[in-house]
């Protein structure tokens, strides 16, 4: 079995990207099969519980106050409405319910409602994940006490390209929040977005950042940029060859993430609705084992449940069931991890 390493060098990761595609795919599939049931994919649902009005200037985001995207700011959703949505997601087959709020960071006054939401969703038997922006250690502890399973805070891209995408929050801010989450005992969900005009070397840096954390994220979402008119990147990349990342390069990124982070759930996230069935199949072969279901991801379109069901039937895939045994196995394997240098 491939050992779990956190001491990957950038040169090693670059060499993985440079491999012949079929060899890379074979290597990723081999690693995937060693740690995960290859025919099972986790189904997740994402709900925006507070949309728009974010003071950050993330160039990809339609919810930024800097974007002229037409997204209207809303208040935090009522607790019961969130729980109703969670119940609907469970009925549709989701095992994981993710909730996002367009904040730079949650205010202390928002935390009681957030805690109530987490407890309510957990009581339904769903795995819970939240993305609320930067967290203080105290807020992370509150979420842990409420029973939150995962906290998402993406690094977005490699450290060298980051400042071309965001100026209101630095790279270390993101890493600090991930550490606060880890210190609180919450599972880490962290990934990024490809196709923002970055180079392959930037994608190497993105994977390297995550693969050399003291402990790999338990969940790694890989997004393909959905260029939204009125956002900095949406307008900058419109009608250019960079407006959509090459499908093979996207699959390469998924494969390299799988090889370097064998235990992580690698999630196909935004951008999947524009991918062909063949591209999605290659991603699953390369080690992606989690998707978002439903018609919408925050403010972006997503492949609907019916399309996903048809694709799963065509590929012989099934929804992941009983993740707890997998988590125990991952904990055991994680004890043998090679430490970061």
UniProtKB/Swiss-Prot annotation:
What PROSITE patterns does the entry give? Answer: RADICAL_SAM
The answer to keyword Translocase applying to this record is no
Q: Pfam families per the record?
A: BATS, Radical_SAM
Question: What EC number(s) are associated with this protein in UniProt?
Answer: 2.8.1.6
Q: Which Gene3D superfamilies match?
A: Aldolase class I
The record lists [2Fe-2S] cluster as bound by 98, 129, 189, 267
Radical SAM core domain: from which residue to which, for each copy?
39-263
Requisite cofactors: [4Fe-4S] cluster; [2Fe-2S] cluster
GO terms for biological process? biotin biosynthetic process
- Cofactor: bound how, per the entry note? Binds 1 [4Fe-4S] cluster. The cluster is coordinated with 3 cysteines and an exchangeable S-adenosyl-L-methionine.
**Which positions bind [4Fe-4S] cluster?**
54, 58, 61
Q: What reaction is this protein's catalytic activity?
A: (4R,5S)-dethiobiotin + (sulfur carrier)-SH + 2 reduced [2Fe-2S]-[ferredoxin] + 2 S-adenosyl-L-methionine = (sulfur carrier)-H + biotin + 2 5'-deoxyadenosine + 2 L-methionine + 2 oxidized [2Fe-2S]-[ferredoxin]
**Molecular function via GO:** 2 iron, 2 sulfur cluster binding; 4 iron, 4 sulfur cluster binding; biotin synthase activity; iron ion binding
Keywords of the record, alphabetical order, are: 2Fe-2S, 4Fe-4S, Biotin biosynthesis, Iron, Iron-sulfur, Metal-binding, S-adenosyl-L-methionine, Transferase
Pathway participation: Cofactor biosynthesis; biotin biosynthesis; biotin from 7,8-diaminononanoate: step 2/2
Assembly mode: Homodimer.
Q: What biological function has been recorded for the protein in this entry?
A: Catalyzes the conversion of dethiobiotin (DTB) to biotin by the insertion of a sulfur atom into dethiobiotin via a radical-based mechanism.
Concerning its family, UniProt says: Belongs to the radical SAM superfamily. Biotin synthase family.
What is the protein name for this chain? Biotin synthase
User: Per the UniProt entry, what species is this protein from, by scientific name?
Assistant: Erythrobacter litoralis (strain HTCC2594)
Organism classification, top ranks?
Bacteria, Pseudomonadati, Pseudomonadota, Alphaproteobacteria, Sphingomonadales
